[in-house]
A protein has these predicted regions:
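Accessory nucleic-acid engagement/destabilization modules that flank
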Residues: 1-164
């Protein structure tokens, strides 16, 4: 699986073929179905980033829908810096219980700990009135904002982007 640019990924117009488009861009053989709610939430997330004038280059090197089949685990968005942190962003199409968000991010940190890097975890929740953002610091869940995500993903440095398995 290869990393992609989020803007390019979200240019898929036909939601029914989004999964095939994603698999082609990422060179993924997984062929996992992508729900329409997931696509809409991803596009909402991207729209918020673009509204804050993010440079297109900072949308590069995202790993979308990475999964570990042996444990049935999927990560919505990862960005893995070679000499920096692992950024984990989970996307939710609606608000769920905060304890469930915290549990998921805690589990994700455990699975990502094999990278031996700092792990920065967020959950982006699309709501009827906009969005909510949460961060997990390894101890507790905190309400956050899109600016903190921007700060984390707009770092200079090389990222892993090829043959991520």
């Amino acid at each position: 699986m290869d990393a992609i640019n989020l803007y390019v990924l979200c240019q898929a117009i036909d939601l029914d073929n989004f999964g095939d488009y994603k698999d082609t861009l990422t060179k993924s053989g997984n062929r996992l179905a992508v729900k329409k709610e997931e696509i809409i939430t991803l596009k909402s997330f991207l729209s918020e980033l673009l509204s804050r004038k993010i440079q297109m280059s900072y949308l590069d090197n995202f790993i979308y829908g990475f999964s570990i089949p042996q444990i049935s685990k999927e990560f919505d968005l990862l960005k893995i810096y070679e000499n920096g942190p692992v950024i984990n962003i989970e996307l939710k199409s609606r608000m769920i219980d905060e304890k469930k968000i915290e549990y998921q991010l805690k589990k994700n940190q455990y699975y990502l700990s094999h990278f031996k890097k700092e792990i920065i975890s967020f959950t982006y929740v699309m709501t009827e009135t906009g969005s909510k953002v949460f961060s997990y610091d390894g101890v507790s869940l905190k309400e956050s904002n899109i600016s903190e995500i921007l700060f984390s993903i707009c770092q200079d440095g090389e990222c892993y982007h090829k043959d991520i398995e």
